[in-house]
Regions:
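N-terminal periplasmic/intermembrane-space "pro-region" immediately following the signal or transit peptide
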Residues: 2, 21-79, 109-113
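Short loop/turn motifs that connect adjacent beta-strands in outer-membrane beta-barrel proteins
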Residues: 25-27, 55-72, 107-119, 170-173, ...
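Residue-level signature of outer-membrane beta-barrel architecture
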Residues: 63-65, 78, 106-110, 166-169, ...
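Transmembrane beta-barrel strands of outer-membrane/channel proteins
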Residues: 72-80, 119-125, 176-182, 233-239, ...
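Surface-exposed loop and membrane-interface regions of Gram-negative outer-membrane beta-barrel proteins
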Residues: 82-98, 112-161, 255-257, 447
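Surface-exposed coil loops of outer-membrane beta-barrel proteins
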Residues: 132-164, 172-265, 398-408
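Outer membrane beta-barrel transmembrane domains
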Residues: 266-268, 284-318, 329-330, 334, ...
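Outer-membrane beta-barrel "beta-signal"
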Residues: 453-465
């Protein structure tokens, strides 16, 4: 059991991380944080409106499409990371990944008369299997806690992120969506994905390891109901499918591999309560009945690694997430310039989730310099605490093998907590080109204190077509 169950659970957890928090810059159009009134603006919070693309109106084709209700956003994103010092493996390496993404919607209201009816879709092409975190920064004998390149997906692949139908009821206060969907269409979208490190990219709900972000689809249906212009209740039912990130599922309509269902619930508040400036807050919980393997306990009550019946499983697990994103200052001549602060927290069921809790906080400043009003400065830090059950299992495996030397390749490191920090400055070279150099600091990569702290230099490039 020791050799069959544990690696499989860790592989699934690592795969969930790799396919999770990667929300491309090209999706950050403010759609997910739309203003409850015309006065609420999320620009200073990191959600900028669409900018003119490199290809302009495409010889008049784009305006024709938009006149017929078809809107799209085509973008390119690349992320380069270099281990400047420290880490598990000190050999220098520059790791590069990139992706093309197409996000689109077709307005159906004019054709059908159904209020706010639309077809929405997302297609993502990812390239290269270059992962600096896996190859240099952390001990490969433990699970991932962060990624230096948040858009790393584990493979070069083109896949469907979502394809859904949506409409509204009750004078647009109730929105319904159904189809092959992704959580980023409805849930945990109060913090943008601008940092290059994974734990500082967006919220924490993907750390549940039971659903996936951005370019992985799964069947479901959701509802959003506006209690007031600023307060929204959200809920849904989705399939829990560990096979969803696989290559065979990239364009599949099948539910093959599904283990149960997910029940996400969230409340989101948009307000001007602080300094009469825009802010957005959320609190969410995610339940699933899909069986999850315990990280330590066996069916008979003792350690699962030596239990003849293997590790026990749980058919009811949960994940809690919350956060806020609040503008704190503004320039007298431009409300969209100023300082904003953010915070996010994810708390998992540590019986089955090796990421017990994770939290991030930081600041953004849009237009720090008068000569560069559209540039961004960002500084953030995140902490990940590993599950006690996971650590107990690692200790027990070492006891079974009689290995106590960390340098023995068969030793199982016992992780505690990891800390990652990032500083970036984003230069808006043109309306369609942004360059974002950054510096990352990794303390106890993957939570292993024996691994040397690491410094990473980074460069993110965003092109809008």
């Amino acid at each position: 059991m020791m050799k069959s169950l544990l690696p499989r659970s860790m592989t699934l957890a690592a795969l969930a991380l790799l396919c999770s928090q990667a929300q491309a810059e090209t999706l950050q159009t403010g759609k997910e944080v739309e203003a409850p009134t015309a006065k609420w603006e999320g620009v200073a919070l990191g959600f900028e409106p669409p900018q003119p693309g490199l290809l302009g109106d495409m010889l008049g084709i784009r305006p024709i499409l938009e006149d017929h209700g078809f809107h799209y956003n085509l973008g390119y994103l690349s992320q380069l990371s270099y281990n400047a010092g420290g880490g598990y493996n000190h050999d220098k390496q520059a790791s590069y990944i990139d992706q093309f993404s197409l996000t689109f919607s077709q307005d159906l209201q004019a054709l059908t008369g159904i209020p706010d009816a639309a077809i929405e879709g997302n297609i993502v092409n990812r390239n290269h299997d270059n992962n600096l975190t896996r190859d240099r920064l952390q001990d490969p004998r433990v699970g991932l806690t962060d990624l230096s390149q948040e858009s790393f997906g584990g493979q070069s692949i083109t896949r469907l992120g979502w394809l859904t139908f949506s409409r509204s009821f009750l004078d647009s206060r109730l929105q319904w969506r159904i189809g092959m969907m992704n959580k980023v269409q409805d849930f945990d979208q109060i913090i943008p994905c601008d940092f290059q490190t994974l734990t500082l990219c967006g919220g924490k709900s993907a750390n549940s390891l039971t659903w996936y972000n951005w370019n992985v689809h799964y069947w479901g249906t959701t509802l959003q109901y506006k209690l007031t212009d600023g307060l929204t209740l959200k809920g849904g039912v989705m399939e829990q499918n560990p096979s969803a990130p696989s290559r065979s599922h990239a364009w599949s309509w099948s539910t093959k591999g599904s283990k149960g269902f997910l029940l996400p619930m969230e409340v989101e508040l948009k307000t001007h309560a602080v300094n009469q400036l825009p802010g957005v807050y959320n609190l969410g919980v995610l339940f699933t009945n899909a069986r999850q393997s315990d990280l330590y306990e066996g069916v008979s009550g003792g350690p699962g690694a030596s239990d003849p019946q293997g590790y026990r499983s749980h058919d009811r697990t949960w994940f809690l997430y919350t956060g806020f994103n609040q503008q704190m200052t503004r320039h007298a001549d431009d409300v969209n310039r100023g300082l904003s602060v953010f915070y996010s927290l994810g708390l998992g069921d540590q019986r089955s989730n090796y990421l017990h809790w994770s939290t991030s906080t930081g600041i953004r400043y849009r237009g720090l310099f008068d000569a560069r009003p559209d540039d961004w400065l960002g500084l953030g830090v995140s902490v990940v605490k590993l599950s006690d059950r996971y650590k107990d299992n690692q200790r027990y495996l070492n006891e079974m093998s009689g290995i106590s030397d960390y340098h023995d390749p068969n030793y199982r490191p016992v992780p505690g907590h990891s800390v990652t920090a990032e500083l970036y400055y984003r230069v808006k070279v043109t309306p369609w080109l942004q360059l974002q150099p950054g510096l990352q600091y990794w303390h106890h990569p993957a939570g292993v204190s024996e691994t040397q702290d690491a410094w990473v230099t980074a460069l993110k490039t965003v092109v809008t077509f």
